[in-house]
């Protein structure tokens, strides 16, 4: 049971990490696009 709990929280953490990573990529993409438009 303990192992299952650990795996579950581990998976959730990885999902949260992936989400924030996508969030960062989107932000960087938006900034880069704005910079190109302004240039």
Swiss-Prot record:
Keyword Zinc present in the record's keywords: the answer is no
Q: Which UniProt keywords apply?
A: Gas vesicle
What are the disulfide bonds?
Answer: none
Q: Which GO terms describe its cellular component?
A: gas vesicle
Which parts of the chain are coiled coil? none
The UniProt entry lists the main location of this chain as: other
What subcellular locations does the record give?
Answer: Gas vesicle
Main function: Confers stability, involved in shaping gas vesicles, hollow, gas filled proteinaceous nanostructures. During planktonic growth they allow positioning of the organism at a favorable depth for light or nutrient acquisition.
Per the similarity annotation, which family is this?
A: Belongs to the gas vesicle GvpC family.
Protein name according to UniProt: Gas vesicle protein C
Q: What is the lineage of its organism?
A: Bacteria, Bacillati, Cyanobacteriota, Cyanophyceae, Spirulinales
């Amino acid at each position: 049971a303990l192992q299952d709990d650990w795996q579950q929280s581990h998976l959730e953490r990885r999902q949260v990490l992936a989400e924030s990573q996508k969030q960062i990529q989107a932000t960087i993409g938006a900034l880069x696009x704005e910079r190109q438009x302004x240039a």
